[in-house]
């Protein structure tokens, strides 16, 4: 089993060119699946049947995985078996006919425009704060994913025309505009970046000069949110959700927001229409004379 896994890691790394973060996630999922199989006396991928795939999901649920995590585990396993079929290691994909547990639809959390203003209202001249403010401004102004922002290089960004070139999911490149506040914040950061003795072309570097890691960016946002008195936990995804929600509230152009977010399917973007409708419903309930609820 390990031999096929090692070949798969090389395939993901070299041919698919997945990010180290994605590769680590795949490895974590599949190694846990190997453990479940080994605990039940199954030592080859050829022995896995659809019923065993369902057993893996049931055992994963006992381990505490919820619907979304179970769907992810099934997706990873299904893709691995697709690879094994292509390599002629197995004849059929046993995960093809297995359905993931139905997920409850959770609306993504965002912060409102006033909270964004509160978040970014900091004119500290400390180099680390200048860097963090540039990260925040760019995340909110462009709706980038954490992985997209973390992988940016100096040549990815053009502050003159206010555009950033992004490599998104599936190695799909897109050009995303950003606003003048983000442009100004990035220019201020570029002036002091040299103080961090950068070791490569990464746009955002640590105080040791290395490219900021995913976790470091998450931690800096948490610290910034607390420092600025935000009432809720701050993370990169929340800024992405806020970008999408505020764009839709202002323009209602779902297709444009889809392009900006880098969603391959419109259905992924449509969850933000539910948020937008929620906002409209609240306005209606508070404003329409025939909609006000009895106390």
Curated annotation (Swiss-Prot):
GO terms for cellular component: cytoplasm. Pfam families: Phage_int_SAM_1 (PF02899), Phage_integrase (PF00589). It is found in: Cytoplasm. Gene3D superfamilies: 1.10.150.130, Intergrase catalytic core (1.10.443.10). SUPFAM superfamilies: DNA breaking-rejoining enzymes (SSF56349). NCBIfam families: PRK00283.1 (NF001399), recomb_XerA_Arch (NF040815), recomb_XerC (TIGR02224). Forms a cyclic heterotetrameric complex composed of two molecules of XerC and two molecules of XerD. Site-specific tyrosine recombinase, which acts by catalyzing the cutting and rejoining of the recombining DNA molecules. The XerC-XerD complex is essential to convert dimers of the bacterial chromosome into monomers to permit their segregation at cell division. It also contributes to the segregational stability of plasmids. This is Tyrosine recombinase XerC.
